[in-house]
């Protein structure tokens, strides 16, 4: 169970936050699997069944070894059995989430990775209520929606691999307080606008891992870790924290990202080790002790699960 938004929310719940996805899941097997997994980690599903309901998106991830022996992942969007396209993302409808808007008041964070009219309406309502609005684009968006998003979002984070740059982030009229560009194996760079004008870019190198199993989802761990440290008191607390505190929070996010690369799957580590082991390993990474023996663990028993059927496949 993954996807940028789903991963970030699940990881935040794992770290002790109350996380609420706003979605339109139906009762198909994929949706039931997603709901069960989210509930396992403490994610709240109060807003997960908005109408009209639809099939839950399904993506297939493969992990292979490159010529250099390192793991690489790729995704496919078609069923290997029937050949049909698997269900894709469908945003919630603006009309159907109007009842949620008043409930967003007092939220610490509103996170969005795909733009739609409903997402922008909810992000604006959240910002009015004091939330830190975080925008992490996963695909290219309609220009008008993007312009509107940048007038609302306080934190904009994106991968250099997808967006060499994102025009307008620090432009006049943008709400951006922090821009983060991840650089893969070389770390990330960031600039802020906590003062009168945008700062220069600052680089934070990546944290090395003792063993590399899969990089998928590392950026989501970075986001969740950063928010867990920097966004507890919404946008007001974020602004008051100062540049040094933001750097510490980003470094914590990078530590979680590094740790996650030691496991297959975007959130594989959550299933593989107990929380006490996670805490010890993060402490070890944070202190600079990256010896492989520091990461020895007894994996949790894995319960075999059947593949989720494609909705288009004949029964």
Regions found by a protein language model. Give the residues of each.
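Conserved post-catalytic alpha-helical subdomain immediately downstream of the catalytic base
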Residues: 207-289, 301-303, 315
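Short catalytic helix/loop segments, enriched in acidic residues and glycine
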Residues: 1-10
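Conserved phosphate-donor
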Residues: 152-164, 169-211
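Gly/Ala-rich phosphate-binding loop of Rossmann-like dinucleotide-binding domains
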Residues: 13-14, 231
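Catalytic beta/alpha-barrel core
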Residues: 110-116, 136-138, 159
């Amino acid at each position: 169970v993954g996807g940028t938004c789903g991963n970030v929310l699940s990881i935040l719940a794992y770290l002790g936050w109350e996380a609420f996805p706003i979605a339109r899941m139906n009762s198909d097997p994929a949706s039931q699997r997603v709901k069960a997994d989210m509930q396992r980690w403490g994610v709240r599903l109060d807003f997960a069944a908005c109408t009209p309901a639809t099939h839950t998106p399904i993506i297939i991830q493969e992990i292979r070894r490159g010529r250099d022996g390192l793991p690489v992942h790729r995704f496919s969007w078609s069923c290997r059995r029937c050949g049909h396209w698997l269900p894709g993302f469908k945003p919630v409808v603006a009309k159907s989430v109007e009842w949620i808007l008043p409930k967003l008041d007092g939220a610490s964070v509103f996170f969005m990775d795909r733009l739609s009219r409903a997402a922008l309406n909810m992000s604006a309502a959240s910002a009015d209520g004091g939330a830190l609005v975080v925008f992490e684009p996963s695909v290219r968006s309609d220009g008008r929606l993007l312009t509107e998003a940048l007038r609302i979002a306080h934190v904009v984070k994106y991968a250099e691999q997808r967006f060499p740059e994102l025009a307008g982030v620090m432009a006049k009229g943008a709400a951006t307080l922090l821009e983060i560009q991840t650089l893969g194996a070389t770390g990330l760079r960031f600039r802020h606008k906590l003062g009168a004008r945008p700062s220069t870019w600052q680089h934070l190198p990546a944290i090395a891992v003792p063993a590399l199993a899969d990089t998928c989802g590392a950026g989501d761990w970075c986001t969740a870790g950063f928010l867990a440290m920097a966004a507890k008191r919404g946008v007001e607390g974020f602004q008051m924290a100062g540049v040094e505190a933001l750097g510490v929070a980003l470094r914590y996010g990078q530590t979680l990202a590094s740790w996650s690369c030691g496991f297959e799957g975007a959130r594989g580590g959550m299933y593989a080790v107990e929380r006490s082991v996670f805490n010890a390993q993060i402490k070890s990474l944070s202190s600079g002790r990256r010896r492989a023996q520091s990461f020895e663990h007894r994996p949790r028993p894995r319960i075999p699960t059947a593949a989720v059927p494609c909705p288009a496949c004949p029964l």
